[in-house]
């Protein structure tokens, strides 16, 4: 198994809509149990898969279903949780009432838009708005790849995709929203046929808030082209 823990920073406003309307906006952001913005792991999976769709290995990595034939995904991706001012993940139920940094996410900016017709003009009654997360907000998530070798280029391809300058998350990407950069990457490989690795793998906490001492840190600048 290969596991990577990745911290992303929004370098432009981020619009990750919940798909539902409320009385404040047409497109509120997704929020977790603490009412803080987060990026669903399913969304990240879809974005990464779409970005890698031209690779011949895409189906074998992310799975496929074609008629009676199919294969499950070899990749598991957690939700990307907000990092607090202490750079710890907001994993699990937290008391955020006294935290000024986290309270700033209670009311988020709203951006106005106009729907454009196929003729390139504004549609009648085409105004809508959406909530966005602040530029500079950081999120952390983990990704696990089921691999037969410790040196799997599929993991490297995924990491290169995430660290690409063209990687975008959420809606409005053509309007400059959703630009992200990797600010931290930790990773480790576990050979589950080896007792020591198996023990370390089983003892690893699933909480993104917990330290991961056996992981190696990789600089973002080392990702592309390695």
Predicted regions and their residues:
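RNA-binding basic/glycine-rich loop and surface signature characteristic of RAMP-family CRISPR effectors
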Residues: 1-226
């Amino acid at each position: 198994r290969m596991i990577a823990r990745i911290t992303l920073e929004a370098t432009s406003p981020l619009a990750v809509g919940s798909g539902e309307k409320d009385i404040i906006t047409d497109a509120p952001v997704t929020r977790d149990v603490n009412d803080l913005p987060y990026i669903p792991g399913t969304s990240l999976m879809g974005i990464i898969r779409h970005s890698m769709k031209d690779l011949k290995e895409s189906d074998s990595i992310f799975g496929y279903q074609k008629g009676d034939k199919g294969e499950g995904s070899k990749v598991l991706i957690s939700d990307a949780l907000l990092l607090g001012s202490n750079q710890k993940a907001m994993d699990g139920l937290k008391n955020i009432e006294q935290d000024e940094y986290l309270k700033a996410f209670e009311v988020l900016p709203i951006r106005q838009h106009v729907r454009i017709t196929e003729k390139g003009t504004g549609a009648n009654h085409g105004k809508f708005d959406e909530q966005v997360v602040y530029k500079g907000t950081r999120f952390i998530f983990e990704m696990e790849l089921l691999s037969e070798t410790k040196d799997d280029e599929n993991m490297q391809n995924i990491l290169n995709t995430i660290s690409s300058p063209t990687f975008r998350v959420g809606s409005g990407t053509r309007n400059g929203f959703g630009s992200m950069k990797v600010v931290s990457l930790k990773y480790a490989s576990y050979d589950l046929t080896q007792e020591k690795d198996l023990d370390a793998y089983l003892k690893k906490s699933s909480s993104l808030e917990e330290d991961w001492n056996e992981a190696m840190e990789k600089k973002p600048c080392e990702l592309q082209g390695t």
